[in-house]
Design a protein with these regions (language model features):
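Short, acidic/small-residue loops that bind anionic groups at enzyme active sites
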Residues: 131-153, 161-168
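C-terminal active-site/capping subdomain that shapes the small-molecule cofactor and substrate pocket
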Residues: 257-348
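Conserved anion/nucleotide-ligand pocket segment
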Residues: 163, 167-225
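Short beta-strand elements in bilobed, periplasmic/extracellular small-molecule ligand-binding domains
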Residues: 76-87, 247
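C-terminal segment of N-terminal export signals and the immediately downstream linker at the start
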Residues: 23-58
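Oxyanion-binding "anion nests"
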Residues: 221-259
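N-terminal small/polar loop signature for handling phosphorylated ligands or for N-terminal nucleophile
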Residues: 82-138
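N-terminal secretory signal peptides and thylakoid transit peptides that target proteins
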Residues: 1-15
């Protein structure tokens, strides 16, 4: 892994709250969005997937690689000519990228939308999207990292469940594929997320699983990349974390920067009112100049005082083996067991 900046260059209606059980389970309903929640239709072999680049640009080789991966899953693909556009570090100008995404939502023949890459730029098109049209044309939308801005905003503005999972440049290995297919292609709930440590990470503490604060919680899922979430605090697209299970990941930020961004999220939003927090892998966020806190020490300092269940090390983030997490779906976490389980289907 490389630091985040180098990495970027390289690559519904409110549900009633359930009462806490005698075992100490903290439970919460689906809150925060004032519109009715919508589940997209499940993906099936033969479906047409629209490819988009809402952030950084991609090469023709990366696009073709993405197409090959999706075809191996049994999908067909389509894309606009602008998918290979370049404007500085963006995949075209803001309006171009927004129009590209809107075209895929409004095209009746497109069944799902896959981001080819993250990078940077999604935040700049949030104000340019027609959320009413997106709501009228619900479909699977998947990506991660920079795409966090779109995942949270589309969910909160439209009620549409979105998916934090591999982009087209990610590794479509057996572990990741199994999770993608389970979440995107099967309309069943009760899915307990698997865990598999990355190869070659045995001596890397960033891949260790551990509990910061024990306990169990239920709530709708919301979250993504910390630096992206931090960047939309104070905007109309600021995520509502209250009574949610918040999932967080990061890459290539020194510990003091993770500390600063997480502190801002805690101070500038309602993250303190989350039902629980589950963290993925914070790759290369533990490389620091002395004197410093370790990543674990910084996370402990900030999150243990919240007195909610918090765990670290689930298989998501900027890693090869990642699970697919649906924003807006009810889930249960057990911080003592470092487990996360979907309680309902994410597609219909």
């Amino acid at each position: 892994m490389t630091d985040r900046r180098t990495f970027l260059k390289k690559s519904g209606a409110l549900a009633a709250m359930t009462m806490a059980s005698a075992s100490g389970l903290k439970a919460s309903g689906i809150t925060g969005t004032q519109v009715e929640r919508i589940l997209p239709g499940r993906l099936k072999r033969g479906d047409l997937i629209g490819l988009v680049t809402p952030g950084s640009s991609v090469t023709e080789e990366q696009l073709n690689d993405c197409i090959s991966k999706l075809e191996e899953m049994g999908f067909r693909t389509t894309y606009n000519d602008t998918v290979l556009s370049e404007y500085g570090y963006f995949a075209g100008k803001d309006q171009e990228r927004a129009d590209e995404l809107m075209e895929m939502f409004t095209r009746e023949d497109v069944d799902g939308i896959w981001c080819v890459r993250g990078g940077y730029g999604s935040i700049r098109i949030l104000d340019l999207l027609d959320y009413d049209e997106i709501r009228k044309n619900p479909k699977v939308f998947i990506g991660y990292s920079d795409i966090t801005a779109l995942l949270t905003s589309i969910y909160q503005e439209c009620g549409l469940v979105t998916f934090h999972g591999p982009v087209g440049t990610s590794d479509f290995n057996r572990f990741s594929l199994k999770s993608m297919k389970k979440v995107l292609m099967e309309a069943d709930g009760d899915y307990k997320y698997p865990y598999k440590r990355e190869k070659g990470s045995r001596n890397n503490p960033e891949f260790d699983q551990y509990t910061l604060s024990g306990g169990r919680a239920e709530g709708a899922l919301i979250g993504g990349n910390i630096s992206v979430l931090d960047s939309i605090i104070g905007t109309r697209f600021e995520p509502d974390f209250q009574n949610k299970i918040v999932y967080l990941e990061e890459i290539g930020e020194k510990t003091y920067r993770v500390d600063k961004m997480l502190f801002h999220l805690l101070s500038g939003s309602n993250l303190k009112q989350a039902a629980g927090i589950v963290m993925g892998v914070f790759g290369e966020c533990n490389i620091n100049d002395a004197p410093t806190l370790s990543l674990k020490e910084a996370l402990d300092d900030l999150l243990i005082p919240l007195n909610i269940p918090v765990s670290y090390g689930l298989s998501f983030g900027h890693i090869k083996r990642m699970v697919t997490i649906p924003t807006g779906i009810m889930a249960a976490m057990d911080a003592d067991k470092n487990s996360l389980m979907l309680l309902e289907a994410a597609v219909v």
